[in-house]
C-alpha cells in the first residue's frame, strides 16, 4: 500500500501486503470472497496456473469445490508480520533503511483486518460477498466484519472465537519466553 498504514500500536510506511487471487471478478464487482489465514499459513491457499503447488486449503478452494472459483473471485491475504511476503519485523523499514526488528509495531487482529481493506481498495473492491477465516483468520474475519460492516455481506468464522481463551494466552506467553530465553536471541536484534 502507499503512504502510512496506521496500526493499533504505531504505524508503518508503505507496507507490502502479499495476497493471491483465484477466479474472475464479475462486472458488478460483487462476487469476491476474502480469506484471512490462520497464524502460520501463507496466502497460497490453493494451486493456480501461476503456482501449481498444492495450497493449505486445496480441498476447499477451486473449480467445483466449496469455494468455487468458477463462481467467485477469491482473495487470500497474507497477514502483516508474517514471513510469507507481507511487511514484518524482518522487512526493511523504508524510513530508517534498517530492518524493523523489534521496532515493528505490535500487531493486533484489527491491524490484520485493516490490511485486508487495503488490499480490497487496491483491487477496487468496495464490498465482499463473504469473508472467511479459520482459527486466527476467523478472529480476523470477525474483526473485519465488525470494523467494516458495510464492506461485507456474509461472515464465515471457523474454529475461532471473539477473543483468546486464558489457556491460549498462557501458551503463547510460554512460547515467547522460550524464544527470549535462547542465549543467542540478543534481545531480538540479530
Q: What is each stretch, according to the model?
A:
Residues 1-190:
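Ligand-binding pocket scaffold of soluble enzyme catalytic domains
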Amino acid at each position: 500500500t502507499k503512504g502510512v498504514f496506521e496500526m493499533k500500536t504505531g504505524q508503518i510506511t508503505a507496507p507490502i501486503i502479499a495476497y493471491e487471487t483465484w477466479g474472475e471478478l464479475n462486472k458488478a464487482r460483487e462476487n469476491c470472497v476474502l480469506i484471512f489465514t490462520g497464524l502460520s499459513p501463507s496466502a497460497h491457499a490453493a494451486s493456480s496456473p501461476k503456482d501449481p503447488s498444492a495450497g493449505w486449503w486445496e480441498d476447499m478452494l477451486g473449480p467445483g469445490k466449496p469455494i468455487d472459483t468458477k463462481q467467485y473471485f477469491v482473495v487470500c491475504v497474507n497477514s502483516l508480520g508474517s514471513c510469507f511476503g507481507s511487511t514484518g519485523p524482518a522487512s526493511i523499514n523504508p524510513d530508517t533503511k534498517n530492518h524493523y526488528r523489534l521496532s515493528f509495531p505490535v500487531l493486533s487482529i484489527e491491524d490484520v483486518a485493516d490490511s485486508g481493506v487495503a488490499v480490497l481498495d487496491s483491487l477496487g473492491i468496495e464490498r465482499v460477498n463473504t469473508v472467511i477465516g479459520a482459527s486466527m483468520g476467523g478472529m480476523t474475519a470477525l474483526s473485519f466484519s465488525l470494523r467494516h460492516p458495510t464492506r461485507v455481506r456474509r461472515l464465515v468464522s471457523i474454529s475461532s472465537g471473539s477473543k483468546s481463551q486464558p489457556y491460549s494466552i498462557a501458551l503463547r506467553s510460554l512460547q515467547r519466553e522460550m524464544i527470549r530465553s535462547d542465549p543467542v536471541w540478543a534481545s531480538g536484534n540479530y
